[in-house]
């Protein structure tokens, strides 16, 4: 396992709405301090969904602070319930929180950096921008939002970056032009992006079209976004006769584990590929929401990351191990 989580009880220190739909929550560990953590880290938080204990991952906002873990949660009407639960938390509430972890490796030696954030994807990008500014790096942050009213932390970012912050507000007709953005970068520039799947996929295609090294484009993800609407779907287990329904508010990974199938997982963000399983048939369409597989691999529909990816209709999978308790 890549992450060896240490869990601690945290209390909610404060909450504030940074936009009408995004709430900042500061969590303070009880009885212990906060150790320094890498820029771009996230924490896993224990939540209750319809009375069931589950977990959700949230990126840490801004720089390291000894005062607490700072996260931002978008209220999502079509979410699986995590954001709804987090929005019920008041100062003094207690939750279980993992130690911070990061899959994002940043090369701090580049001469130029392009940061791109889409919507709530600003949460990990904020801290990266602050770290680069401290290093006097050549950095530009492109912030794509529906409107300026929907732009979380806009005042703080403006103060930090000045004219290095470029806001692309959709309602003002200022959509980001990825071809133009990438064409203006020096040859050794690194780009780091976090946003919805459509933005990530578009960036990957335009980056390749610009003949830039794939390793110079790095991602931070949030798994709730997809190319298709979130709906319930069916998973058939090859040669077993079993069919498992995945509700619209549950992940495929959770549904398989609850049905007794042991599916290994790690990041649960669609980044590491540990949970990937084989797909042998598709009766409908797969909505690949990971950034682990390449575009070509996704088009073949031979594997799926069940932690974030979904389907419309039904899929048949194999190579799953049914634990002894479920067999009895």
Task: Walk through the language-model features, giving the residues of each.
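FNR/FR-type flavoprotein reductase catalytic core
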Residues: 3, 81-241, 245
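Short flanking/linker segments adjacent to small metal-binding domains or redox-active Cys/His motifs
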Residues: 171-173, 247, 309-328
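C-terminal accessory/binding modules appended to enzymatic or scaffolding proteins
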Residues: 233-264
